[in-house]
């Protein structure tokens, strides 16, 4: 039993015990019989309820319905495994943040963020994070509990995450930044090209069409290509590992690496737009590990959401 289930089980038992005390103190002749019924029937029911999947599915359904009814800015993240999606989320929300719900394929996070510090206006944000390597995990397994039911999607911002170096594990743990930099400093251009090719295989026009058909509605207001791990790129450039590229031209070099993906996303995005519905597209370079540029990509969508006077909870 999880900690949450144990807590609820204990609360149910306490409530039952309070009922026993109240019945016993009432002085009613039927009191002993009612207490016996509680002991024989209610406690086993509580035990079964606290450990049965059906019971918890019912609770989860109530919670999910409430989640969809609650106004929020909703983000949908798409990218290869190891590209930094979860790190990006935790960089913005805080490293200790935990998902509201997590499965083998999917997790989502919720938080409250300030729209502006002067008025103290805040809004709720919901961020979906899909695990693993298969694109189907992002599309076929898309949770209507978070992004809304088909035909009534609630997604406001879509992030396509790419990076210049994969996640590499050694002895069952991912390399830290220093170790990854050491690995990338040898045959740098070849390794970067290989990683870009992996993203090109993952973010293809056919998949993009499915992604947009999965998340699209008039609630979608922004699409962003997020180029992650720019800090690593700056460091290998400073080390002279990429001939002809200087620190002043790092951003341009990174944009050129993913120019084809940028074009594919723009084209897919244009196919779902209409004269009365414009989706803003941008390309942003970030470092999820040190936070560079991370707040901007989320805050731009939140500001656009607010400026368009969409329904938002103001506190």
Question: What is each residue range found by the language model?
Answer:
Residues 84-85, 284-315:
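Conserved GTPase G-domain signal focused on the G5
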């Amino acid at each position: 039993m999880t900690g949450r289930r144990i807590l609820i089980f204990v609360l149910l038992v306490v409530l039952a015990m309070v009922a026993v005390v109240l019945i016993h103190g009432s002085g009613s002749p039927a009191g002993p019989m009612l207490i016996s019924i509680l002991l024989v029937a209610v406690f086993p029911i509580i035990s079964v309820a606290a450990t049965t999947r059906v019971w918890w599915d019912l609770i989860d359904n109530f919670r999910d319905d409430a989640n969809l009814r609650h106004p929020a800015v909703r983000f949908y993240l798409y990218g290869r495994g190891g590209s930094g999606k979860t790190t990006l989320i935790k960089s913005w929300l805080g490293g200790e943040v935990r998902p509201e719900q997590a499965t083998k394929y999917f997790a989502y996070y919720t938080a409250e963020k300030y729209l502006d510090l002067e008025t103290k206006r805040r809004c709720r944000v919901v961020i979906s994070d899909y695990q693993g390597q298969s694109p189907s995990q992002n599309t076929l397994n898309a949770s209507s509990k978070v992004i809304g039911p088909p035909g009534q999607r609630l997604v406001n911002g879509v992030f396509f995450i790419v990076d210049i170096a994969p996640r590499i594990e050694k002895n069952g743990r991912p390399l830290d930044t220093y170790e990854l930099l050491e690995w990338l400093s040898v045959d740098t251009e070849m390794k970067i090209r290989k990683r870009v090719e992996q993203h090109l295989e993952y973010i293809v026009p056919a998949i993009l069409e499915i992604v947009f058909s999965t998340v699209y509605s008039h609630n979608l207001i922004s699409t962003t290509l997020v180029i992650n791990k720019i800090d690593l790129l700056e460091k290998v450039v400073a080390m002279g590992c990429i001939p002809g590229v200087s620190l002043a031209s790092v951003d341009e070099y990174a944009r050129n690496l993913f120019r084809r993906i940028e074009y594919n996303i723009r084209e897919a995005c244009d196919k779902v737009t209409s004269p009365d519905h414009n989706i803003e597209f941008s390309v942003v370079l970030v470092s999820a590990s040190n936070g560079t540029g991370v707040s901007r990509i989320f805050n731009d969508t939140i500001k656009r959401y607010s400026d368009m006077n969409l329904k938002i909870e103001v506190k």
